């Protein structure tokens, strides 16, 4: 396609050494939950203040190569009236956009869901490109306690593949994200088995839809035991299982694998990423974290202008920790108790 070279260049830039993605594409409702946790009302002004804090962290671009935005943010300005997209570009951070329309029940399945958003996606993607976005994200989920049924896996894979083809057609590098939810009592071997099945289907349909592998990025879940499982897995074990999965299922043509944190604590997410980068990989193995980058910063800010600088330093510390983990050089110095806290049961975006 006409964007082929540009797609490859964008994907390679996002997957550059020591850098990863800041996911800040929470919907307004989810952003509201985050604000609520620090006692703030969910108003556009408060969302704008928080997003301004995130994108204006000095030197953030040294550790962050891309930022995923919610549609409101792509068209929003900072508190002092600069376009958020422009601020990111000045920071050397590529703007991205969440394009899916969320999850709805999948009729005919075992109480599972599927992802909406293909209708009108081509014209929306073209508009997002015009607005400065250069990559896209589509998140679908697979639930292990509910099966997953063959139907749900097929629907997830097909939807992702259609979205990826449409994105590339409009100049956006698609981030392919079939999140295998942490919920459940299953052990790590069961997660591994399901993940193999999911990624086999995803790549089958990506190929069927003529998606250019050099111009995509992946956002997988790490292979871990279920959140309610009796077993806990060390970073070494998580890395062993996850890399084994990637080696079996992900072609080396794919430039970058940007893991989601999916409810791990901030420190856990960094330790696991570090363990995966202890030896060389055929792809850039990095991060695309939301809560695992933002959590301590949010709590530090608390909605108070006088805390902005400290909150920005907290975010930079996390970004730098994950940058070191991408290089396999993270040692875990200076971590706060907040950063070590487990997230939550029934974690959802």
UniProtKB/Swiss-Prot annotation:
UniProt-reported outcome of changing residue 29 to W: In strain: cv. Little Marvel
Protein name per the record: Fructose-bisphosphate aldolase 2, chloroplastic
Cellular component annotations (GO), alphabetically ordered: chloroplast
Subcellular location: Plastid, Chloroplast
Name of the top EC class for this enzyme: lyase
Keywords tagged on the record: Chloroplast, Glycolysis, Lyase, Plastid, Schiff base
One GO BP annotation of this record: glycolytic process
Gene Ontology terms for molecular function: fructose-bisphosphate aldolase activity
Chief location of this protein within or outside the cell: plastid
Site (Necessary for preference for fructose 1,6-bisphosphate over fructose 1-phosphate): 349
Species in which this protein is naturally found: Pisum sativum (Garden pea)
Pathway: Carbohydrate degradation; glycolysis; D-glyceraldehyde 3-phosphate and glycerone phosphate from D-glucose: step 4/4
Active site, renumbered: 177, 219
Similarity field: Belongs to the class I fructose-bisphosphate aldolase family.
EC id: 4.1.2.13
Catalyses which reaction(s): beta-D-fructose 1,6-bisphosphate = D-glyceraldehyde 3-phosphate + dihydroxyacetone phosphate
Binding-site residues for substrate, renumbered to this chain: 47, 137
């Amino acid at each position: 396609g006409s964007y082929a070279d540009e797609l490859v260049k964008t994907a390679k830039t996002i997957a550059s050494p020591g850098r990863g993605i800041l996911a800040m594409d929470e919907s307004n409702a989810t952003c509201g939950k985050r604000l609520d946790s620090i006692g703030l009302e969910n108003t556009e002004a408060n969302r704008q203040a928080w997003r301004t804090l995130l994108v204006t962290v000095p030197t953030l671009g040294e550790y962050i190569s891309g930022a995923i935005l919610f549609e409101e943010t792509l068209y929003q300005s900072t508190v002092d009236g600069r376009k958020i997209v422009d601020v990111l570009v000045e920071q050397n951070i590529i703007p991205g956009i969440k394009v899916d329309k969320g999850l709805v029940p999948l009729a005919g399945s075992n109480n599972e869901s599927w992802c909406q958003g293909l209708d009108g996606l081509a014209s929306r993607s073209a508009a997002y490109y015009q607005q400065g976005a250069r990559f896209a994200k589509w998140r679908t989920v697979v639930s292990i306690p509910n099966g997953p049924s063959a139907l749900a896996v097929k629907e997830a894979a097909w939807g992702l593949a259609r979205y990826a083809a449409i994105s590339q057609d409009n100049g956006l590098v698609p981030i392919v994200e079939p999140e295998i939810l942490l919920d459940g009592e299953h052990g790590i071997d069961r997660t591994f088995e399901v993940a193999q099945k999911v990624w086999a289907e995803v790549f089958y349909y990506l190929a069927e839809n003529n998606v250019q592998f050099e111009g995509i990025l992946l956002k997988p879940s790490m292979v871990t035991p279920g959140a309610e499982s009796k077993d806990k897995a060390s970073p070494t074990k998580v890395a062993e299982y996850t890399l084994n999965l990637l080696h079996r299922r992900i072609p080396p043509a794919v430039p970058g694998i940007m893991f989601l944190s999916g409810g791990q604590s901030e420190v856990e997410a960094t330790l696991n990423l570090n363990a995966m980068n202890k030896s060389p990989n055929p792809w850039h193995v990095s991060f695309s974290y939301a809560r695992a980058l933002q959590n301590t910063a949010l709590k530090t800010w608390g909605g108070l202008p006088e805390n902005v600088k400290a909150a920005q330093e907290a975010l930079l510390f996390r970004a730098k920790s994950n940058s070191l983990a991408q290089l396999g050089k993270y040692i875990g110095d200076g971590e706060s108790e907040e950063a070590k806290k487990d997230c939550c049961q029934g974690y959802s975006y």
